[in-house]
């Protein structure tokens, strides 16, 4: 509701709140503890719900994403003096690959919304059928809009990647959608199991 500008404003508000929380964590006085808390509690997870809902729109409103990434950058620069662009990039990587897990909202926005839409597709498909049955929308309209938005986000992500990575995106999205469809069907049959998502 409220359009892209309203969502960008919500995101900036969340970034401002995160900055205030970083300022409070700073009082701890220990850079190791502060870094751990910043990654675990004040990272991109603070805005993940917004990125999953409208990451593509926020990606186009780069200033909104930068409002959050600037907070992360400021904390990292303060805790690791002399941090250059390459060090910040490494810090944004996951712990398993030698980073600090301080992911940037800009890097997560498109994958988050694409994953969310892939998982939501079976639910949207069912809702589309129910709305058509009730005479509220023409059959296929809601699903077509959902698929168009998903396709646009996939195209945006592919444009950000090198050719080798970009060729994998559609396959990964198709696999995620197929897995989501099977999981949704199992839930509808009362056989669903709610797995806990792994931490990155």
Model-derived segments and spans:
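Nucleic-acid-interacting cores, centered on viral/eukaryotic replication and modification enzymes
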Residues: 1-200
């Amino acid at each position: 509701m409220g359009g892209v500008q309203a969502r960008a404003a919500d995101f900036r508000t969340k970034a401002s709140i995160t900055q205030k929380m970083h300022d409070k964590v700073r009082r701890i006085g220990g850079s190791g503890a502060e870094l751990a808390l910043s990654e675990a509690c004040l990272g991109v997870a603070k805005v993940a719900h917004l990125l999953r809902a409208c990451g593509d729109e926020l990606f186009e409103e780069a200033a909104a994403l930068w409002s959050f990434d600037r907070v992360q950058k400021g904390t990292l620069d303060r805790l690791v003096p002399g941090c250059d662009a390459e060090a910040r990039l490494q810090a944004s990587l996951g712990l398993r690959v030698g980073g600090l897990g301080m992911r940037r909202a800009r890097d997560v926005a498109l994958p988050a919304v694409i994953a969310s839409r892939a998982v939501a597709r079976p639910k949207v498909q069912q809702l589309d059928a129910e709305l058509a049955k009730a005479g509220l929308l023409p059959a296929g309209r809601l699903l077509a809009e959902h698929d168009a938005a998903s396709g646009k986000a996939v195209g945006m992500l592919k444009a950000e990647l090198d050719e080798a990575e970009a060729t994998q995106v559609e396959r990964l999205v198709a696999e995620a959608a197929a897995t989501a469809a099977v999981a949704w069907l199992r839930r509808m049959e009362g056989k669903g199991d709610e797995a806990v998502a792994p931490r990155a």
